[in-house]
């Protein structure tokens, strides 16, 4: 018996081929054959898709499981949605870029970027790129690709990268982290007002004039000299002082008239007193320079006298023969510009030559001189020490020249130099 083909209706379902209402009951619930690639029987008797991670079904639709930072945009495209965090000076800008936020002052601005820079930062423009650079001045430089401090000797770096000064002999670092000089206290070096100084002792001093051109107070160390000592042209110590001699009182060699014999300032007296321990070595001469009875000598004149009187301090009294402005301590060929106030050491000793008006043997020094140095014209010179009882003077000396009356008529009075000595007061 042949079987005829069965016709299929339009609503025939090959998975569930039998209509539960019209056909006979299905003899078996076993599903037709299917591939396990992408399919599964879940629940039992139901054929369904088997999605793997990250797919899953949601509201009857297959969709993707989205984790943190991933999302779908309005068109259904998968996008990243990362939540970024920034702390000042970082901030977010367009297209999720984060620039540095700088102090809002006017500075060069990088084109197309919201950067503002304060010096030393700036933009180095080129045809290819605009490069952020840092400007630096003296003392800084590049070492490889790093900014570094440039050091010159004696500066260097220690093992920890700190700047230090290389110290040599004569310098050290104190406990207070200060650089200090090493000095030899035992060799005459000391600190004075924060500076190194020479510790000079007795007999030494600093000079009064600078020895270095253009340097103030560059004074040399000198031997400290007492009264009566000086340096000669070779720098050796010598007795006396050729520039400022406090061992010599004199009238100077100036030819100007300085004393009175018969009239005011009619003669030039040259008198030099030099202290030699307890003795005074003296030289005297006199010359009339103005017209009068001594220039020329008249027949009525046979003597000439010069008087010098001093107070208790040995200061010359001006109301007597010699002008005070031509009398003082020797300084070169002149006298010290500052009037002296004490010269008792040059005065005739008041014990050896007591003050008296009468002529005594011990008060007088007698010698012979010559008229204008002519040995054929002798004169008698009498030097009297402290030979006055004048209450205004404590010490005195006078020079009395005498000759035979009528001997030198017509000549100008002048007496050659005469040297003598006497005992000093001190």
Curated annotation (Swiss-Prot):
Forms spikes that protrude from each vertex of the icosahedral capsid. Interacts with host receptor CXCAR to provide virion initial attachment to target cell. Fiber proteins are shed during virus entry, when virus is still at the cell surface. Homotrimer. Interacts with host receptor CXCAR. Interacts (via N-terminal tail region) with pentons. It comes from the Viruses. GO terms for biological process: adhesion receptor-mediated virion attachment to host cell; cell adhesion; symbiont entry into host cell. This is Fiber protein. SUPFAM superfamilies: Fibre shaft of virus attachment proteins (SSF51225), Virus attachment protein globular domain (SSF49835). It is found in: Virion; Host nucleus. Coiled coil: none annotated. Belongs to the adenoviridae fiber family.
């Amino acid at each position: 018996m042949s079987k005829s083909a069965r016709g299929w209706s339009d609503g025939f379902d090959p998975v569930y081929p039998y209509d539960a209402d019209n056909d006979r009951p299905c003899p078996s619930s076993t599903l037709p054959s299917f591939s396990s690639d992408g399919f599964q029987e879940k629940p039992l008797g139901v054929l369904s898709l088997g999605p793997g991670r990250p797919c899953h079904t949601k509201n009857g639709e297959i969709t993707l499981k989205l984790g943190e930072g991933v999302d779908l945009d309005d068109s259904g495209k998968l996008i990243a949605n990362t939540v970024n965090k920034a702390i000042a000076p970082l901030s977010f800008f367009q297209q999720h870029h984060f620039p540095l936020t700088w102090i809002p002052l006017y500075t060069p601005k990088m084109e197309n970027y919201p950067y503002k820079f304060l010096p030393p930062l700036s933009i180095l423009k080129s045809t290819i790129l605009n490069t952020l650079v840092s400007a630096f001045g003296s003392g800084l430089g590049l070492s490889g690709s790093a900014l570094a401090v440039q050091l010159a000797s004696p500066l260097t770096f220690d093992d920890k990268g700190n700047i230090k000064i290389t110290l040599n002999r004569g310098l050290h670092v104190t406990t207070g982290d200060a650089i200090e000089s090493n000095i030899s206290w035992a060799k005459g070096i000391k600190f004075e007002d924060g500076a190194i100084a020479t510790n000079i002792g007795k007999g030494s001093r600093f000079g009064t004039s600078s020895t270095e051109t253009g340097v103030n107070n560059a004074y040399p160390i000198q031997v400290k000299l007492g009264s009566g000592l000086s340096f000669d042209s070779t720098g050796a110590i010598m007795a006396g002082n050729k520039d400022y001699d406090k061992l010599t009182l004199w009238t100077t060699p100036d030819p100007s008239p300085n004393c009175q014999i018969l009239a005011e300032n009619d003669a030039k007296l040259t008198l030099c007193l030099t202290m030699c321990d307890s003795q005074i070595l003296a030289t005297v001469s006199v010359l009339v320079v103005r017209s009068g009875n001594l220039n020329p000598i008249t027949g009525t004149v046979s003597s000439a006298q010069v008087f010098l009187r001093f107070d208790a301090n040995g200061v010359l009294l001006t109301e007597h023969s010699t002008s005070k402005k031509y009398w003082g301590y020797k300084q070169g060929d002149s006298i010290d510009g500052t009037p002296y106030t004490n010269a008792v050491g040059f005065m005739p000793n008041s014990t050896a030559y007591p003050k008296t008006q009468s002529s005594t043997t011990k008060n007088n020094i007698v010698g012979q001189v010559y008229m204008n140095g002519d040995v054929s014209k002798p004169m008698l010179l009498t030097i009297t020490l402290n030979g006055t009882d004048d209450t205004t003077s404590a010490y005195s000396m006078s020079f009395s020249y005498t000759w035979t009356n009528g001997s030198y008529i017509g000549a100008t009075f002048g007496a050659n130099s005469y040297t003598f000595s006497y005992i000093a007061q001190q």
